[in-house]
Amino acid sequence: MEPVDPNIEPWNQPGSQPKTACNQCYCKKCCYHCQLCFLQKGLGICYGREKRRQRTTTPYASKNHKDPIPKQPLPQARGDPTGPKESKKEVESKTKTDP
């Protein structure tokens, strides 16, 4: 494509830029407004500086992560230490009453 006027830069040639300015509308007509609009709006390609995104946390999600581990009951020794003594007493009392 030959420039119309060789003394003018290619980006200033007639027809190289649209007559209307770019806008924030995403309709079909505005997406095909110019090459820049097509890349950004139509294809979603933007070569600009990316902004940092802040994490959005919900109170429900943060609550789940902060729950402490449920406490487990303390391990108990097998058999009750007072159990065998009582059972012996019960056996002795039963044997005494039975004869």
Curated annotation (Swiss-Prot):
The modification Asymmetric dimethylarginine is found at residues 52-53. Disulfide bonds: none annotated. Gene3D superfamilies: Tat domain. Asymmetrical arginine methylation by host PRMT6 seems to diminish the transactivation capacity of Tat and affects the interaction with host CCNT1. Acetylation by EP300, CREBBP, GCN5L2/GCN5 and PCAF regulates the transactivation activity of Tat. In addition, the non-acetylated Tat's N-terminus can also interact with PCAF. PCAF-mediated acetylation of Lys-28 enhances Tat's binding to CCNT1. Residues 1-24 are annotated as: Interaction with human CREBBP. It comes from the Viruses. The record marks 11 as: Essential for Tat translocation through the endosomal membrane. Transcriptional activator that increases RNA Pol II processivity, thereby increasing the level of full-length viral transcripts. Recognizes a hairpin structure at the 5'-LTR of the nascent viral mRNAs referred to as the transactivation responsive RNA element (TAR) and recruits the cyclin T1-CDK9 complex (P-TEFb complex) that will in turn hyperphosphorylate the RNA polymerase II to allow efficient elongation. The CDK9 component of P-TEFb and other Tat-activated kinases hyperphosphorylate the C-terminus of RNA Pol II that becomes stabilized and much more processive. Extracellular circulating Tat can be endocytosed by surrounding uninfected cells via the binding to several surface receptors such as CD26, CXCR4, heparan sulfate proteoglycans (HSPG) or LDLR. Neurons are rarely infected, but they internalize Tat via their LDLR. Through its interaction with nuclear HATs, Tat is potentially able to control the acetylation-dependent cellular gene expression. Modulates the expression of many cellular genes involved in cell survival, proliferation or in coding for cytokines or cytokine receptors. Tat plays a role in T-cell and neurons apoptosis. HIV-1 lineages are divided in three main groups, M (for Major), O (for Outlier), and N (for New, or Non-M, Non-O). The vast majority of strains found worldwide belong to the group M. Group O seems to be endemic to and largely confined to Cameroon and neighboring countries in West Central Africa, where these viruses represent a small minority of HIV-1 strains. The group N is represented by a limited number of isolates from Cameroonian persons. The group M is further subdivided in 9 clades or subtypes (A to D, F to H, J and K). This is Protein Tat. It comes from Human immunodeficiency virus type 1 group M subtype K (isolate 97ZR-EQTB11).
